[in-house]
Amino acid sequence: MNVIEGVVATPDARVAIAIARFNHFINDSLLEGAIDALKRIGQVKDENITVVWVPGAYELPLTVRALTKSAKNGGYDAVIALGTVIRGGTAHFEFVAGECSSGLSSVAMDSEIPVAFGVLTTESIEQAIERAGTKAGNKGAEAALTALEMINVLKAIK
């Protein structure tokens, strides 16, 4: 039986992180977690990490698409999308969260480059804070580890 599993240690990986500025007080923690995981666990060199700030989560799919096109030309091995969408009193949450998730998935499928989903979609600020490095771990770090593992899984498949 042949089993393919990815490892997270990927010292030569080139990784881009697209991060939303909206809700930055939460996203900053996601970014810290992602960078820490890339460098400490994945052994990715600092010069191989690029951070791109965008206004909000809705802008992430377009930005990630541009970064994956760069990847096809020798740019990035994976892209991590980070952001936070918190439910409010209007339908805005559904539109932003849904389009962001759908758009990022579409980019990953079209580009065949790992796109790690580190966008929090929560009911409250408290839930977001818990997922950005307190009670529920750091979803930015989890997204970074997912990106690294997927780089290696896809290399092994090809």
Curated annotation (Swiss-Prot):
One BP annotation, GO: riboflavin biosynthetic process
Chain sites annotated for binding 5-amino-6-(D-ribitylamino)uracil: 22, 57-59, 84-86, 117
CDD domains the record matches: Lumazine_synthase-I
SUPFAM superfamilies: Lumazine synthase
Pathway: Cofactor biosynthesis; riboflavin biosynthesis; riboflavin from 2-hydroxy-3-oxobutyl phosphate and 5-amino-6-(D-ribitylamino)uracil: step 1/2
GO MF annotation: an example: 6,7-dimethyl-8-ribityllumazine synthase activity
Residue numbers annotated as active site: 92
A Pfam family assignment: DMRL_synthase
Binding site for (2S)-2-hydroxy-3-oxobutyl phosphate: 89-90, 131
Coiled coil: none
Catalyzed reactions: (2S)-2-hydroxy-3-oxobutyl phosphate + 5-amino-6-(D-ribitylamino)uracil = 6,7-dimethyl-8-(1-D-ribityl)lumazine + phosphate + 2 H2O + H(+)
Family matches, as InterPro entries: LS, LS/RS, LS/RS_sf
EC number: 2.5.1.78
UniProt keyword annotations, A-Z: Riboflavin biosynthesis, Transferase
Cellular component GO terms, alphabetical: cytosol; riboflavin synthase complex
The protein's role, per its UniProt record: Catalyzes the formation of 6,7-dimethyl-8-ribityllumazine by condensation of 5-amino-6-(D-ribitylamino)uracil with 3,4-dihydroxy-2-butanone 4-phosphate. This is the penultimate step in the biosynthesis of riboflavin.
Family of the protein in this entry: Belongs to the DMRL synthase family.
HAMAP family: Lumazine_synth
Matching NCBIfam families: lumazine-synth (TIGR00114), PRK00061.1-4 (NF000812)
Matches recorded under PANTHER family: 6,7-DIMETHYL-8-RIBITYLLUMAZINE SYNTHASE, 6,7-DIMETHYL-8-RIBITYLLUMAZINE SYNTHASE DMRL SYNTHASE LUMAZINE SYNTHASE
Protein name as it appears in the record: 6,7-dimethyl-8-ribityllumazine synthase
Organism: Pectobacterium carotovorum subsp. carotovorum (strain PC1)
